[in-house]
Design a protein with these regions (language model features):
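Residues within well-ordered beta-strands of beta-sheet-rich folds
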Residues: 214-216, 237-239, 252-254, 425
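Extracellular/luminal low-complexity segments enriched in Ser/Thr/Pro
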Residues: 194-210
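Short beta-strand edge segments in extracellular beta-sheet folds
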Residues: 235-246
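Conserved hydrophobic ligand-interaction patch in extracellular adhesion modules
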Residues: 252-260, 300-325, 329-334, 338-341, ...
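A short beta-strand micro-motif common to beta-rich folds, especially ectodomain repeats
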Residues: 209-221
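Surface-exposed, low-complexity/disordered Ser/Thr/Gly/Pro/Asn-rich loops and linkers
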Residues: 173, 181-187, 363-416
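Solvent-exposed, low-complexity, repeat-rich "mucin-like" stalks and linkers
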Residues: 2-189, 247-284
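Short, exposed coil/turn segments at beta-strand boundaries within extracellular/luminal domains
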Residues: 221-235
């Protein structure tokens, strides 16, 4: 018997009583105490299918037997409390992880493969080579990532690709300084320097949590008055999260969206109410009785913030600025009209106002961040490179040989603009 048989996820003490005896009705003789034992545990995750065996949800039982009698014998079963603050647990794991010392983030299984995003899962010091996106793959120059040779539909494709200048080799040259453009947790990613052909930085173990940072390299040019600290030549996303977000099989998505960080992640490890059924057997007579108990689930609450990317761009929207429409008026102010690829890479505010949407989707489509008119001039220079045609959509920014757009079925070639970490790519629209 039990006063109740349904318990909340955090109610771990489950009291019940057993009364076990036998008597001959009408004999006038006193009832006989019958010793008893719990002879079987069964559990169910759905209330329909039952599995025999003591389940993990039962942490302890005060006693599995008794002497019997007409007086009830009290027992207590203890349930496990499997409610987790997964966000706190993940952050603790990041803090407890062994600190890295000069780890090269581009080395994968003994071979170098570069990317625009590197995952960090512990405090310490790190480095990565100053290379355009995935321009090095498995230790060799990945030319197809920035100078594709088999484009289908070349009138709607850009080739070669551009950084601050035309990309002709994997290595970025001319960089004189490196800095954190922004970080979701202030001062978490710091000590950013250039050392030879590498960018070096540190992650503060005492502040580590799920976060994102953008590291950029610059030169000493002050091409535009607003950017006296130098032009950005390229930038990289440092994603601080658990290693298991990329622990997937070939052909599967990452376990979390790119750059995701939790603001809340808590609940029980089980999402349906779970049940345990006890079978009590009298030792002498073999008679049985059952009792069923339920432990309720706590719904999983999982919330967070992720990165948003405009089609073809390697960098996410700046998280502090809302998305907005760019001007379709007569102004030639690039910060109002939005920027083409070459200039968005060069500007130190490449994460901010240049990330805008076109206000005339019927003629341009809001994906056309590179669509410009020949009259768009700034500082005497057009906002496009020699290979960019005005008012054109470029389909191959993430899919190197795809100048066709929807329906292209050729081999996917990841580009230097792809924001994904090594081993992953932006999926093609099915």
């Amino acid at each position: 018997n039990a006063a109740k048989n349904i318990f909340d996820y955090n109610e771990t003490n489950v009291p019940f009583t057993v009364t076990s005896y036998s008597e001959v009705t009408g004999s006038g003789r006193p009832a006989k105490a019958e010793p008893w034992t719990i002879t079987k545990y069964e559990s169910s995750a759905d209330g329909t299918t039952w599995t025999e065996g003591k389940p993990s949800m039962v942490a302890a039982m005060s006693s599995e037997s008794g002497n019997g009698g007409t007086s009830a014998e009290a027992r207590t079963m203890t349930f496990t409390n499997e409610y987790h603050d997964y966000k706190a647990e993940r952050e603790k794991a990041l803090r407890d992880a062994t600190e890295e010392n000069g780890k090269d983030l581009s080395m994968v299984n003994g071979s170098r493969s570069t990317a625009n995003c590197y995952i960090v899962s512990a405090g310490g010091t790190y480095k990565f080579p100053m290379v355009y996106g995935n321009a090095i793959k498995n230790g060799v120059d990945n030319t197809e990532a920035y100078n594709p040779s088999n484009i289908v539909g070349s009138s709607t494709a850009i080739n070669p690709f551009w950084g601050a200048t035309k990309i002709t080799s994997p290595n970025i040259v001319g960089a004189t300084k490196a800095e954190v453009l922004w970080c979701s947790t202030p001062d978490l990613v710091k000590d950013v320097t250039i050392d030879g052909g590498y960018v070096k930085f540190s992650v503060d173990k005492t502040k580590i949590k799920e976060a994102s940072a953008i590291i950029a390299v610059k030169n000493n040019d002050a091409e535009y008055p607003a950017y006296k600290s130098g032009n950005v030549l390229w930038s990289w996303h440092i994603w601080i999260t658990s290693k298991d977000v990329v622990d997937t099989d070939n052909g599967y998505f990452m376990r979390q969206p790119l750059g995701f960080r939790h603001t809340k992640w808590q609940g029980t490890s089980y999402q349906q109410d779970r049940k345990v059924r006890l079978t009590v057997t009298q030792t002498r007579t073999g008679k049985t009785a059952t009792a069923e108990f339920t432990q309720k689930a706590s719904p999983m609450e999982r919330e967070g913030e992720t990165m948003y990317y405009q089609q073809g761009r390697k960098d996410p929207f700046y998280p502090e600025n809302p998305m907005a429409l760019q001007s379709n008026g007569g102004s030639n102010d690039a910060l109002r009209r939005g920027l083409t690829l070459i200039n968005s890479v060069k500007f130190a505010t490449l994460m901010a106002r240049p990330r805008k949407l076109w206000s005339d989707p019927t003629t341009k489509g809001n994906w056309d961040w590179m669509a410009i008119s020949t009259g768009d001039i700034g500082n005497g220079e057009p906002y496009y490179s020699e290979s960019v045609v005005a008012n054109t959509t470029y389909f191959n920014l993430w899919d190197a040989n795809n100048g066709q757009g929807h329906g292209y079925t050729g081999t996917f070639v990841k580009t230097v603009y792809d924001p994904s970490p090594v081993g992953f790519r932006v999926p093609r629209l099915a």
